[in-house]
């Protein structure tokens, strides 16, 4: 997980555009997010996932800004190497988790560890990486709102 403090303007614009495409999604309202909060939340997740690096590649095989796994990208019908499609897939997948689990923290845990792990543990799994991921994203998110 990379966490630089700022993204290049072109990347910020792509992340903002991806978030804006889904600003009226029912899961956003159900979680209590305004469009501004959703945008800050999505930016924060991308910051932690990839450090805003289009070419980010994890040892597990996750790719791009939203760090999509190949199987998830196929499921979503996106090319994970294309930054616009990667972000679109990441936004949709995060919204699926938000809709399924109802809270920002559980959605992040499901995005990181998989929805099966969140169901199995009935909450954030006890994996250090996942707990750190959720903590980092939420801290950056809260900071973006101030």
Where are each of the predicted segments found?
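Catalytic glycan-binding domains that act on GlcNAc-containing polysaccharides
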Residues: 1-146
